[in-house]
Amino acid sequence: MLKAKRILIAAGGTGGHINPALSVAGYIRSQDPTAEILFVGTADKMEAKLVPQAGYPIKMIDISGFRRDLSPAGIVHNIKTVSKMFKSSSQAKKIIEDFKPELAIGFGGYVSGPVIRMAAKLGVPTAIHEQNAYPGVTNKTLAKQVDAVMLTSMAAEKYLEPKNPCMLTGLPVRAEFFTADKARSRLELGVDSRPLILSSGGSLGAEPINRAMVELIAARAPKGDCCFIHATGHSGTWVTDELKKRGVDPDKFENVTIREYIDDMSRCMAACDLFINRAGASTLSEIEALGKPSILIPSPYVAENHQYHNAMTLVEKNAAVVIEEKDLTGEKLTEEVEKLLSDRAGLDKMGENARAMCVSDAAQRIYDCLCKVVG
């Protein structure tokens, strides 16, 4: 059992950092219900809502990242960021001195920097978890100072200079991604025996993906030989009207379902034969858990282009195909889909390769690593 009774967790900015942190916090609590867990985040990011919703207390510090443009606004922002760096270190020190943690864990995001750095300086055992195949700036710096570096993919190791050897732990995935059954999921969704293509433009609705999917659905749906579930995202509500203009009315085509969001992702992914999506770390871990072949379209708008590096870990194992957004067209996507669907054995092999990459006991591995850190 983890000897630490008071655990400080720093995670923020995006769900990609926060959700793994919440998963690990939940696992720690499952092993020791008396453990005191305190999160540290920033007031204007997702953690301010997600962490309290999950039932954990959270303290806030004032921190932001640097902008890379040299516009007047960018320069002003960066000057303020330097000021916040000094302020956030003082805030982190006070939180640590008040809470007196016996272990501090960073899951990425700018907030992890001052918190984990200060914890290490004050002699608190420390660990970080890197979700992506290309580490963020914060974790690159912290790796030199912390007691343990945990990785989702060993591809990240070559970009780090850790004080101690890195440990492969994988990324925690919700249990339903391991238990969802394909036949039952298809029955619940009303999908017959035809191949099902599941796709998403992300929560906001990436226009290049939505436009390419309109082309693909317009080309393939009238043939009636496959089914589609596509999530447009918040800004993609135009997709249905565009499909209607092209002669594909989702209300009249029983093989086409258009949603704004997919809130039953484990069921839809279990049911599908091919998944088209971005390449965030959590998404890839879910793909691996369910063993699904995929076409990945990495977001070019993320730090260090890390989604491309994430995607390439699957491509190198013949578990996925990558189309960069700059190369994405409806024609190219349609061509790739038709090529994959025409080779069922090859498609199944891609899924098997994805499943072989899965670290199914990620939460346990992280917990075991933390036990070693505390001693």
Report residues per predicted region.
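Conserved nucleotide-sugar phosphate-binding/catalytic loop shared by glycosyltransferases and other
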Residues: 4-14, 31-87, 169, 201, ...
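A short, well-ordered alpha-helix in the C-terminal region of glycosyltransferases
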Residues: 346-360
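C-terminal alpha-helical cap of glycosyltransferases
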Residues: 359-375
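Active-site-proximal region of nucleotide-activated glycan assembly enzymes
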Residues: 38, 46, 57, 120-182
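Donor-nucleotide binding loops and adjacent catalytic segments primarily
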Residues: 50, 182-275, 308-312, 316, ...
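Acidic donor-binding loop of glycosyltransferase active sites
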Residues: 101-103, 266-284, 292
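Structural loop-to-beta junction motif characteristic of Rossmann-like glycosyltransferase folds
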Residues: 56, 124-125, 273-274, 291-299, ...
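Glycosyltransferases and closely related glycan-assembly transferases
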Residues: 91-104, 111-127, 140, 144
